[in-house]
Regions:
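Generic intrinsically disordered, low-complexity segments enriched for polar/acidic and small residues
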Residues: 7, 47-50, 67, 148-150, ...
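Active-site catalytic motif of lipid deacylating hydrolases and related acyltransferases
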Residues: 1-63, 155
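Generic structural motif
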Residues: 38-41, 89, 146-148
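Short, surface-exposed linear patches
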Residues: 28-29, 116, 147
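Serine-dependent carboxylesterase/thioesterase catalytic core
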Residues: 2-5, 12, 50-141
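Residue-identity detector for threonine
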Residues: 8-11, 18, 63, 102, ...
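C-terminal catalytic histidine-bearing segment of alpha/beta-hydrolase fold enzymes
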Residues: 127, 133-178
Length: 178
């Protein structure tokens, strides 16, 4: 079983036409590359119930999960999900922004923070921008982290960027064909 999860950012809802939803639509066209295995490709909001969702994914017994995440989806959703998964996780992170799990720590999103990754995480794509007041935070830990690539977008448009979509689609093709 192959599992791909696209996690949207702050203020993004699944019913809205966002860069995350556009990416999810692109990735859904790839599931026929799975060479006989089943594939599910889900779009999730950053503040989903990650404990229940991880239980569901774990019940499918995948050997690896691919997560493409943006903003708080990368700074909160992805770390919350990946630490609960019982398999390796590959990540394409687009301008991930730290989000504290506590109410008192929420203001930390406006300062440079580090996003700690669990030991089962490999970052295969990492895009950020540095021009906006709210910019991507550093990823640390995990199995391995690829080089961060910085682009000339603001935070609210980088998830629509062709660079993010190309990197995510390439990672998904590689994942589905292995």
């Amino acid at each position: 079983m192959k599992v791909i999860v696209v996690i949207s950012g702050f203020t993004q809802k699944n019913h809205q036409n966002t860069g995350s939803k556009q990416l999810w639509r692109e990735l859904r066209l790839l599931d026929d590359l799975c060479d006989g295995e089943d594939a599910i490709i889900h779009l999730k909001e950053w503040d989903s119930d990650w404990k229940s969702y991880a239980e569901y994914i774990n019940s499918l017994e995948p050997t690896e999960v691919l997560i493409c995440c943006y903003s708080w989806g990368g700074g909160y959703g992805m770390p919350q999900l990946s630490k609960r998964l019982q398999c390796d996780v590959s990540v394409v992170a687009c301008d991930p922004v730290y989000h504290s799990p506590t109410i008192l720590g929420r203001w930390w999103a406006f300062f440079d923070r580090k996003i700690k990754l669990d030991k089962n995480v490999t970052v295969v794509g990492w895009l950020s921008q540095r021009g906006d007041r709210l910019d991507g935070d550093k990823l640390i830990g995990g199995k391995s982290i690829c080089r961060e690539r910085t682009f000339d977008y603001d935070h609210t448009s980088i998830d629509n960027s062709p660079e993010y979509h190309q990197i995510a689609v390439l990672a998904a093709k590689t994942y589905l064909q292995t």
